[in-house]
């Protein structure tokens, strides 16, 4: 009996040593996972993955010592130490960090709906977008700025009349990151001079600024695209009408040329026929008559030779 007890004790001691080695290996694996897992995939180690690394020898050791092996359902789970709770804490931290990133992403998406857009109905002459951005940036962070140039026809007329050749802008839109900055800009600049240093070229120019409530930059892009489409359709319509007028004019010109050629040919044929008729030799014979009742112009005068002969005879 003592021999059997000694065998059991020796067996349990060997298995306990082997179990300690496995625990150390498991602890090293956990430490390595904690130190080197920066990504989300490396931090997903949990108790189920660690439990798969346990060998059947541990279960036999627990059976020899009278301990029940832990089942997959977790009905009989031995109390874990503080070192074994670190992966769970790490997982909780990663989950919190992930939630924080998601909240930040949602906040950045919602920030697009909190931007403010102002409308500039009048731009100071020859002011460039860089200068306008510098002026508007005094009221807050400016995101996007769009200034609409004058049309080419007015630019040519101005240059032709002796004006400046620089580019002028008629109107513009500016988008602020924060809505309150856009409202502050509209309330401050509307109807007031730009100010600044007295030697500034735009010191005395008056600004017309209006805050567009409920208006977003996407609405502006859609409006500009719609205006471009309408302008393009009008241009195509005008071009088609001009082409029709040109085709009709060319057809009328060709028709008039054809009619003129027909008339000219007809007159030419008539003239040629008249000329041929006038050049024919016509010999008109003189009408004579011996009748007593005939007029004197038609009577044939007596021959002089015959009268001479008769005169000599008598």
From Swiss-Prot:
One MF annotation (Gene Ontology) recorded for this entry: ATPase activator activity
UniProt biased composition (Acidic residues): 1-17, 37-55
A GO CC annotation given for this chain: small-subunit processome
Biased composition (Polar residues): 289-314
The keyword rRNA processing belongs to this UniProt entry's keyword annotation: yes
Entry keywords, A to Z: Nucleus, Ribosome biogenesis, RNA-binding, rRNA processing
GO aspect biological process, one term: endonucleolytic cleavage to generate mature 5'-end of SSU-rRNA from (SSU-rRNA, 5.8S rRNA, LSU-rRNA)
Biased composition annotated in UniProt, kind: Basic and acidic residues: 18-28, 83-95, 267-280
CDD domains given in the database record: RRM_ABT1_like
Subcellular location: Nucleus, Nucleolus
Cell division found in the keyword field: no
Positions of region (Disordered): 1-95, 260-314
Primary residence: nucleus
Disulfide linkage: none
Function: Involved in the small subunit (SSU) processome assembly and function, and in the 18S rRNA synthesis. Required for the early cleavages at sites A0, A1 and A2.
Family recorded in the similarity comment: Belongs to the ESF2/ABP1 family.
Protein name: Pre-rRNA-processing protein ESF2
Organism: Eremothecium gossypii (strain ATCC 10895 / CBS 109.51 / FGSC 9923 / NRRL Y-1056)
Gene: ESF2
């Amino acid at each position: 009996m003592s021999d059997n007890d000694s065998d059991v004790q020796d067996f349990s001691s060997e298995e306990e040593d082997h179990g300690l080695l496995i625990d150390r290996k498991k602890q090293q694996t956990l430490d390595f996972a904690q130190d080197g897992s920066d990504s989300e995939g490396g931090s997903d180690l949990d108790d189920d993955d660690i439990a798969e690394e346990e060998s059947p020898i541990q279960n036999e050791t627990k059976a020899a010592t009278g301990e029940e092996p832990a089942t997959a359902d977790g009905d009989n789970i031995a109390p874990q130490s503080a070192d074994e709770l670190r992966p769970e804490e790490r997982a909780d931290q990663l989950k919190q960090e992930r939630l924080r990133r998601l909240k930040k992403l949602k906040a950045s998406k919602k920030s697009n709906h909190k931007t403010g857009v102002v409308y500039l109905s009048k731009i100071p002459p020859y002011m460039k977008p860089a200068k306008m951005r510098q002026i508007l940036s005094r009221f807050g962070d400016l995101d996007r700025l769009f200034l609409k140039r004058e049309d080419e026809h007015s630019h040519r007329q101005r240059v032709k009349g002796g004006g400046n050749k620089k580019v002028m802008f008629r109107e513009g839109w500016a988008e602020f990151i924060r809505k309150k900055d856009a409202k502050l800009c509209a309330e401050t600049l509307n109807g007031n001079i730009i100010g600044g240093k007295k030697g500034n070229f735009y010191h005395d120019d008056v600004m017309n600024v209006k805050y567009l409530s409920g208006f977003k930059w996407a609405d502006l892009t859609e409006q500009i695209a719609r205006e471009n489409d309408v302008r393009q359709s009008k241009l195509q319509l005008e071009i088609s009408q001009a082409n029709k007028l040109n085709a009709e004019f060319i057809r009328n010109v060709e028709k008039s040329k054809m009619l003129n050629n027909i008339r000219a040919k007809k007159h030419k044929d008539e003239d040629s026929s008249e000329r041929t008729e006038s050049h024919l030799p016509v010999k008109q014979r003189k009408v004579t008559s011996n009748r007593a009742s005939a007029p004197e112009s038609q009577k044939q005068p007596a021959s002089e030779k015959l009268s001479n002969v008769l005169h000599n005879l008598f």
